[in-house]
């Protein structure tokens, strides 16, 4: 039993056996409200404290989810929808639920394009982190119209905009007040997320109002959560019109959330291949965190350039095939179509479109079909270019991109994030996805040079980062081990396994051609004195 500032909760003890046969025991506390149910007058308001309860509340089952039905058909990730009103809740997994434990904390924000996703996924329970002495907390937040619609009557009767962002802040405040009771140290918090969750943590990193809530950031395949007011207001107007109401809280409160969800899909769906304009022209996530000058004061890029969050540790990267699987159901619909006019229609120049297709042909990927080529273009423009740009913009020096290769296999982004989170011993590890050990070793010798970070890595094909302050006695602290840049010579000019060194290439512009398959990793440090030009001797066992 653990006592929070709203009341006592009772969790359950679970056992976990890892792939290497290690067994560990951890406690789980699920569905704990961190805010009042966002219904009635609170539906479009800022989050408010939950109603306190007497006695001991059962916390052995996941709580209600903001997602009522998955927007992905078929679902790509096991993220269940659970009915109920108390949708703003947190689930905690801890190896030691005692106030004296003082363990590091990982707070995870799920993805789903800000219209879907669930904190109740079995992929997010954090068993492996608990095994290695890390407390995990998974937050929910309002989605779609409920969380991100731009309402014209904001400022009256408690109505606010950027409600989903305010939910993140409120959840992190709950962590600061309560995580010590679960064995966590509120001064050692790392926030993490993948896809829209990665965008969320980058958004939080660049918000002055959030700086006291965490010390490190893990952003996996983040998109740019910096929608302009005009784009969000227009998307809100279209959804409201299709749903039979005005873009105000007063009018929208009479419409059920499922109606907004259905028309959000019909009006502007990023999974509809008949609307390729979303790739280059329009904001792909219009109902998303909005730069309003108040909650979100600046774009992520501008805030990074201004040095906001420069004292925080940052791990940022993206999968090479972030969006290809999203277009897989449309493979037959797009089969045989020339991708060049589709890319031009999407806003790319004809020269760029032909470059994209030619690059796919050179890599032998054109035979995979038009859906694959379009998916790669979306991955590059929406996700991978953000990673390179933000790492370069990060105050403290340039950060050329690096990659680990995966033999051309398709990367399923959340499954990779899940494996990273669930199997790494107190670290986030990115490595080749498929193939035998022997084949992987051959691949490493052939094309995986060593890292050129100031500290080096244990393996040329594996990148690790330990969350803040999780290093054990006798080992370097996480600050000492934090890399500035992870980069590999075939693409960036860093020193290779053979000891050769070529001229570094700058990070790709968003309009550049897609990069080879694999996993893109960028590591950016808060320490400006650590720069890739500092050549170091490779160290083993880091």
Show where each model-derived region lies.
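Substrate-access "cap/lid" subdomains that shape
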Residues: 177, 211, 220-342, 375-392
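Serine-hydrolase-like catalytic core of hydrolytic proteins
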Residues: 72-249, 304-327, 396-398, 463-464
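Intrinsic-disorder-associated, low-complexity terminal segments enriched in Asp/Asn/His/Tyr and depleted
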Residues: 509, 527, 531-534
């Amino acid at each position: 039993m653990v006592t929070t500032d709203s009341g006592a909760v009772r969790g359950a003890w679970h056992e976990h056996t890892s792939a290497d046969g290690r067994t560990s025991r951890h406690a789980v506390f699920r569905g704990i409200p961190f805010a009042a149910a966002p219904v009635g007058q609170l539906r479009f308001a800022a989050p408010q404290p939950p109603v306190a309860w007497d006695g001991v509340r059962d916390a052995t089952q996941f709580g209600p989810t903001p997602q009522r039905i998955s927007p992905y058909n078929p679902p790509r990730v096991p993220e269940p929808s659970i009915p109920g009103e108390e949708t703003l809740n947190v689930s905690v997994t801890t190896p030691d639920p005692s106030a004296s434990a003082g363990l590091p904390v990982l707070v995870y924000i799920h993805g789903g394009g800000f219209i879907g996703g669930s904190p109740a996924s079995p992929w997010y329970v954090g068993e492996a982190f608990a095994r290695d002495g890390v407390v995990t907390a998974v937050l929910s937040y309002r989605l779609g119209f409920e969380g991100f619609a731009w309402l014209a009557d904001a400022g009256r009767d408690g109505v606010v905009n950027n409600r989903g962002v305010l939910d993140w802040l409120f959840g992190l405040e709950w962590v600061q007040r309560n995580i010590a009771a679960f064995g966590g140290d509120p001064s050692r918090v790392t926030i993490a997320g993948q896809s829209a969750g990665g965008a969320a943590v980058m958004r939080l990193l660049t918000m002055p109002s959030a700086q006291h809530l965490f010390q490190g950031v893990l952003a996996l395949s983040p998109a740019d959560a910096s929608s302009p007011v005009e784009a969000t207001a227009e998307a809100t107007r279209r959804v409201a019109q299709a749903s039979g109401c005005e873009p105000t809280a007063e009018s929208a409160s009479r419409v059920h959330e499922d109606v907004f969800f259905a028309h959000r899909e019909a009006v502007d769906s990023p999974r509809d291949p008949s609307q390729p304009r979303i790739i280059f022209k329009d904001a792909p996530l219009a109902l998303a965190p909005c730069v309003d000058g108040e909650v979100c004061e600046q774009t992520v890029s501008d805030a990074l350039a201004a040095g906001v969050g420069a004292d925080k540790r940052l791990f940022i990267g993206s999968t090479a095939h972030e969006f290809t699987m999203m277009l897989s159901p449309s493979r037959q619909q797009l089969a045989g179509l020339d991708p060049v006019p589709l890319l031009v229609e999407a806003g790319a120049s004809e020269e760029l479109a032909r470059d994209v297709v030619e690059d796919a042909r050179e890599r032998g990927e054109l035979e995979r079909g038009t859906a694959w080529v379009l998916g790669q273009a979306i991955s590059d423009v929406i996700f991978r270019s953000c990673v390179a740009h933000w790492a370069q913009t990060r105050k403290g020096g340039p950060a050329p991109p690096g990659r680990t290769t995966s033999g051309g296999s398709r990367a399923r982004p959340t499954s990779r994030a899940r494996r990273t989170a669930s199997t790494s011993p107190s670290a986030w590890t990115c490595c080749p996805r498929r193939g035998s050990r022997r084949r992987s070793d051959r691949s490493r010798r052939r094309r995986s040079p060593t890292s050129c970070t100031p500290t080096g890595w244990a393996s040329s094909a594996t990148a690790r980062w330990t969350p803040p302050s999780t290093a054990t006695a006798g080992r370097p602290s996480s600050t000492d081990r934090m890399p500035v840049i992870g980069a590999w010579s075939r693409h960036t000019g860093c020193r290779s396994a053979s000891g050769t060194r070529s001229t570094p290439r700058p990070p790709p512009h968003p309009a550049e051609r897609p990069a080879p398959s694999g996993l893109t990793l960028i590591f950016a440090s808060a320490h400006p004195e650590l720069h890739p030009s500092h050549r170091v001797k490779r160290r083993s066992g880091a």
